[in-house]
Amino acid sequence: MMRTLITTHPLLLLLLLQQLLQPVQLQEVDTDFDSPDDEMEELEEYLEEFQSTGPTRPPTKENVERRVIIEPGMPLYDRDYCNEEIKRKNVYHKYRCVTEHYFLLMQYDELQKICYNRFVPCKNGVRKCNRSKGLVEGVYCNLTEALEIPGCEYKSFYRTGYVLITCAWQNEIHKLIPHTINDLVEPPKHRSFLNEDGVFVIPP
């Protein structure tokens, strides 16, 4: 019940809880109703992120799995894929819609391994990204309407390509973990991504 309410009416639930919790602190919320601990933890995470005025918290495996990794089910080429999945997975930044997002049909462990691949230019040409060695299926979501939830509307683009990601070091586990999905680059037909030295390059 709690998960259904969170995924279908996130803004309404957050506004209601803000009124109920003032001036009570979040840790003082009465949790004597029937709700699994993990669902309460997820709700608290949403509230903390929405109300925070500081920098965005570093990514975790759980966040990446929840927001990026998808399972076979709804056809990836469905025109409403992004609208449905972004609402279902609560992919927002504070009270605003994200301008773009990627969903990837792969396992988290496979995505994490990309962090140890060689560097390539990101799509903006400024930063360095890590590229997958093989092609990955996914969906690119581009915001077309609204800036604040729940009015986010997206156009969906099915892609099969090389994943470009940035990674961050996590001290707790002493490993690199995926930070952001930078792009899903579709290879041009009959054209190699390797130059004469065997180094991967992004075509202009």
Swiss-Prot record:
This is Inactive ribonuclease-like protein 9. Glycans are attached at residues 130, 142. GO terms for molecular function: nucleic acid binding. Belongs to the pancreatic ribonuclease family. One of its GO terms (cellular component) is extracellular region. Residues 1-26 form the signal peptide. It is found in: Secreted. One of its GO terms (biological process) is defense response to Gram-positive bacterium. Its main location: secreted. Disulfide bonds join 97-152, 115-167, 122-129. Does not exhibit any ribonuclease activity. InterPro entries: RNaseA (IPR001427), RNaseA-like_dom_sf (IPR036816), RNaseA_domain (IPR023412). It comes from Chlorocebus aethiops (Green monkey). Keywords: Disulfide bond, Glycoprotein, Secreted, Signal. SUPFAM superfamilies: RNase A-like.
